[in-house]
Design a protein with these regions (language model features):
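Compact, glycine/acidic-enriched structural inserts
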Residues: 43-98
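Residue-level signal for secondary-structure boundary elements
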Residues: 82, 86, 103-107, 244-245, ...
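A surface-exposed partner-binding patch
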Residues: 1-46, 120-263
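Compositionally biased, intrinsically disordered low-complexity regions
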Residues: 5, 37, 55, 60, ...
């Protein structure tokens, strides 16, 4: 999908900072960011999320897995657009064509049946690989991906492979629910990036210990200033000595946001 593709009900202007684990694809009207979620220095599988950073509703610091494949994300967005616009218009059709989606009429039919985007669970692209957001927070046992579920919170070893943005209880009555995150933070056995008051100091200790995965998870947790985070990812790239990661770090460091902004 090329950069010039017009995303219905989406925009390309990045209005607020985001953690380097996220590679943005588009921004929604609510200023959430849809994109690739890729963990470095970890065996976690890349996936696709909607990231709630600084939104029109305030700062949320929450990531939701919206698709385990790029096509799932596109199908989900098509469903939402068709529902909001009450059918397939020229812009939606052009977007589907540009993304190689040939069954937009089927998505239209599914949307007419009512329900939310989770009604796509019967579509061939989703069968056997549902994203975590298709499951209720209290019923995730059938999920087969590796985005953190609620069960992860009870495993210190599993939490070592997670960043803070991934641990939450979703929304309750349209408000963010941080019950799970708060419980993890109160557990003295949890990784330090869930508990620290200074991510930058913790990052330095983890990097000095050559714990690249821990340093990365720390860097992708809330309460960083961009100035500190820019220095941190530069130091991490130097230690990792990986060409692809260095390219990501350089791009992220040069994003057009002020040093005193937070993410």
């Amino acid at each position: 999908m090329r950069g010039q593709v017009r995303v219905p009900d989406g925009e390309r202007s990045l209005l607020s900072p985001f953690p380097p684990v996220l590679v943005p694809i588009w921004v929604t009207g609510a200023r959430t960011i849809v994109g690739l979620w890729k963990h470095w220095f970890s065996d976690r599988q890349p996936t696709f999320v909607e990231f709630y950073g600084t939104t029109v509703y305030g700062r949320r610091n929450m990531a939701f897995e919206r698709g385990r494949t790029l096509k799932q994300v596109i199908y989900g967005h098509l469903f939402e657009c068709i529902t909001n616009r009450d059918g397939v218009d020229d812009e939606i059709q052009a977007f589907a064509n540009a993304c190689g989606i040939s069954d937009v009429d089927e998505i239209d039919r599914i949307s007419i049946d009512g329900g939310d985007v989770t009604t796509l669970r019967s579509h061939a692209e989703f069968v056997g690989k549902l994203p975590l957001s298709f499951f209720d927070c209290d019923n995730q046992t059938d999920y087969t991906g590796d985005f953190p579920t609620n069960a992860v919170a009870s495993s210190t070893a599993a939490l070592q492979r997670c960043c803070v943005h991934e641990i939450h209880s979703g929304f309750q009555n349209l408000e963010p629910d941080y019950t799970l995150r708060e419980a993890v933070a109160q557990n003295s056995n949890s990784p330090e990036w869930f508990r620290t008051t200074s991510q930058s100091e913790l990052f330095e200790r983890l990097l000095n210990a050559n714990d690249l995965e821990g340093a990365w998870m720390c860097l992708n947790s809330p309460a960083w200033t961009l100035a500190n985070a820019r220095q941190a990812i530069t130091d991490l790239a130097a230690r990792a000595n990986d060409t692809a990661f260095s390219a990501l770090a350089t791009t992220w460091v040069n994003l057009p946001f002020a040093d005193d902004e937070m993410f």
